[in-house]
Amino acid sequence: MMADKMSINVTSKINSITLVLAMALSAFANGQVRDSTLHFVDSIQLQIKDSSQLPKPKLKTLKGVVFDKTINEPVAFATIYFPKSTVGTVADEQGYFELNFEKVPNDTLRIQAIGYKTFNYIWSKKSIDSFALFVIEQSNTMLKEVVVKAGESPSILFMKEVFKHKNGNDISTNSNYAYELYNKLEADVTGLTKEQFEKIPFTKPFSFIYNNLDSTSEKESFLPVYLIEALSDYYCSNNPKGQREIIKASLQRGIENESIAQFLGSMYQNINCYNNFIDVFNKKFISPLSSAGLLFYKYRITDTQYVKGVPVIQVQFKPKRKGENCFFGSCWIVDSNYSLQRIQLNIPEEANVNFIDKISIYQEYKPLDSTRWFLNKDKLSAHFILPYGSKLPGFIGRKTSSYKNIHVNEAFILDSINRVAQQKELSIVAGAKDKDKSYWLENRHDSLSQNEKNIYKFIDTVQTLPVFNLYKRVIQVVTLGTYDTKYFQFGPYWSMYSRNRIEGTRLRFSMGTTKNLFKDLYLFGYAAYGTLDQKWKYKGSALYLLNRAPRSYVYASYKHDLDRQTGNYEDATSDYLFGNVIRKSGVPIKLAFSDEYRLEFFKEHFNGFSFHTQIVHKDFTPYSPLPSNFIFEQNNNNGMSLSNTEFGIKLRYAYKEKFLEGDYLRASLGSKYPIIELKIAGAIGGFLKSSYTYQKAQLSVSDNVNIAPFGNLYYKVFTGKVLGVVPYPLLEVHPGNDFHYYNRNDFNMMYRYEFVSDRYAGFIFEHTLGNGVFNYIPVIKKFKFRQFWNLKALYGNLSKENYNLNNPSSSSNNYTFRTLANIPYIELGTGIENILQVFRLDFVWRLSPTNIVESIPRNFGVFGSVKFEF
């Protein structure tokens, strides 16, 4: 009566990468729990082996494990049964189950779990006595609301207790703690089918990639392309404040960059669900355990379970209102002390986050002692997509963390922090990247899957292919504008051609060195030629890194070129392919020619303090309409040019500022604390060809303040003074904007060289609201626009002596420098950002002064810009 016993081996393993891929291809439930019928044989390939020689069992057995599709974690206490039968069971806390029956009741196996969609698997009656992995998908739907007429909802009462006890349960509030941290970061290309791949030109050399495509079905595939691991010791003290992390081992394939290893550290990637706000890709989301959680979330108690003999309460949560930065998901709370046992966070479809289709966070805690639970496992996965590129291949990033050797309130922790008090908080030990295979086998917290093991060999093989390097260069040219050979870098291409009224057509060739030529020395230079003035311009510079951490360097340069007076990287410039296209019409271009010699020394300390000294000699010759006669002829000048040698120092304090390191240069990622800068400079008349004696100083404080859930505030306040009687190039020439490209640090409705001062003060203020009012307009909110407003103000004045020098009555030049002595400069702006996820549109009003002397006076302007932000 019974069929021969069949043994079933799973050949298509559902590993962690496969489960992350499934996240990218799943859809949200639109408010309803949906049944999904999948053909089991399509999802898990089974290889059946004949075992007729074995004794026939009395009962047939189906064994398996139920996994969460998004986070690759077992689903505890799921219900597995055959509909319209009495055959069923409940999985244990590890998702494992066994079903025993004499015959297969029907061909449908149903799996249900609270917080998940119901899944029906078409089960082959021949596939029995087997072990299989079942993958189910989370539902963005809570149980139906139960109306409690008398008193508060039990869910609300329970969560109030959780909020009340969270400070005691949060280990990070203890005096000190320490642990060993293992981090793993993986990147995969997803949605790349064989058919799509074959359509890409010149892919024949990559044919072996087909063997590295993992899939759960013929339609779902992804290609692992990058893997990095890091092992570190982390120490933290709250009283006194201090922290220290030592990355003792790192292993990576793909991008060779030390700062990537740093960003895997605990200080860069630490998510604490007990906090009121959780930072996800620089966006503040309200935690479901926030003290104000009842204002933003709906909670429902859905189940009681036992984990390691301890009763835990499952609570589902979701946002009260769509469009707010909140999560949906579930948390499991220990019944005895209201601490977290595990939590699953998902970002809803309506969340205003760019370039990301889905984000999932999973944390699991384990008992530290009889009363305290500490974080044991932490997973973050995100599916990145191009704007409006749902049909294009995407990208999955997945970070997995685990914690061992946990210590709380022990004396050695503070000693470890104090022992290295003069060093930086995050460091990488020498030889961290040189650990061998045996070290990782012994110290890795969890073994790599077979797929992850293949990544190291796979990436090494790909990078040796000439076609791969060609693709890399093409992508670099398109995105960065530069082209690299082994020893030299050429570009950027957008500076190769431009036009202006002085030079006519300007052609420029730029070249720099790469780390393959000099490890710590960067040489850069360019040559340019103007067809109208028929003059060559050029620049040569050298940067030598004395130390990378803490950073110190010397820099020297010589430039023989037009002086465009650009003050920061956001300034638009005419030395640009599209510079004339975005210039304001009717505004004369104001240029000067300069010969500039520069020598700099920079030294940074681990505590965030740095000093930057420089000596700059410049010969400055302005072009009309900027004046020179009767201004520069003071102190034996020839009246047409200004010669000056300035000594300067900049003191800067940026506590816990983060950087993204390049081969030689670096980009600041900002700080959570205010950044303070003090600049002091001066010159001595007659010394090193200086024509004037003066001193000047400027002080500024800037900060980005997150005021979630009300958005983000940026402010900058500044003041300065110039002592001495000097011509306008040595005064404070307030930064105006002659382009329709918006600049956050300039006064966009002010013209360049419109106002000068020898004493001044001002501020810049911008409030980004997020969705703002757009969240309440039914059709508009689907576009996920973001709202902001800003205010800029400046007061400045000139001494009588400086005013008379720079506006001489005997001058034949009609150009007049203005001051802000009688009325401050004020501009007010608002606008829309996140247009098509990358563009920003500013509407700016100049409130005062309104008496504009340019040929086309404007009190209102429209500006565009590009802004890449999650």
Tell what function each PLM region has:
Residues 53-57, 132-142, 146-151:
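Conserved "repeat-terminator" motif of extracellular CCP/Sushi domains
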